[in-house]
A protein has these predicted regions:
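Conserved beta-loop-beta element that borders a ligand/cofactor-binding pocket
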Residues: 1-17, 42
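Short, surface-exposed helix-loop/turn micro-motifs enriched in polar/charged residues
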Residues: 2, 20, 133-136
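C-terminal substrate-binding subdomain of Rossmann-fold SDR/epimerase-dehydratase oxidoreductases
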Residues: 7, 33-175
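Short beta-loop-alpha junction of Rossmann-like oxidoreductase domains
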Residues: 16-19, 125
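Active-site "substrate specificity/gating" loop of NAD(P)-dependent dehydrogenases
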Residues: 19, 23, 46
Length: 175
């Protein structure tokens, strides 16, 4: 007996309900928490890393499509945002969502061990089924900010997560 299956490879998923407490959960959490607390976000490496962010609602839409479309049977699909950007540009977008004018990202002199320099997913195969991402980076950050504003007890999260990454030797000085 054969079982129908589909494999989905997700790029960097963003949106509300992304953990505040996961020290390694990414740029949206790090930058939003920093701006929310009136601090400068940490920009690792030189900020020119490329990332392919995708909104959680677009991921849900992609999953529903492959569940319902027989052309997806036994196939593998990349699920990405379709518009890769640099970490610096992402930080500028977060600053814009938070109403911060003239923000210029400054690298902090550290890097996260194990981070990939550039991440970009080829979504053309999924697009051939009629799917395309419809939410922008701005949409994802705005949604996360709204969820962040409804949270409580997050005052020391940035320090906690940075310390945790240093303890695990994940956060290191650039040499």
């Amino acid at each position: 007996m054969a079982y129908l299956s589909v494999a989905m490879r997700y790029s960097i998923v963003q949106g509300s309900r992304q953990s505040f407490y996961n020290a390694y959960s990414g740029a949206c959490r790090i930058f939003c928490l920093a701006f929310h607390q009136g601090k400068e976000p940490q920009i690792y490496e030189d900020g020119n890393q490329i990332r392919d962010f995708v909104n959680i609602h677009d991921v849900v839409d992609a999953n529903l499509l492959v569940l319902e479309d027989d052309r997806a049977n036994y196939e593998m699909f990349n699920v990405g945002g379709g518009a890769p950007i640099t970490v610096k540009h992402f930080a500028e977008t977060v600053a814009e969502v938070f109403g911060i004018q003239d923000y210029k990202p400054k690298p902090c002199g550290k890097y996260r061990f194990g981070d990939t320099r550039h991440i970009w997913s080829d979504i053309s195969k999924l697009e051939s089924l009629g799917w395309k991402p419809t939410r922008t980076i701005y949409d994802s950050v705005s949604e996360y900010k709204e969820w962040l504003n409804s949270a409580s007890s997050i005052d020391n999260i940035i320090e906690y997560c940075s310390k945790k990454m240093e303890e695990l030797n994940v956060l290191r000085d650039v040499s």
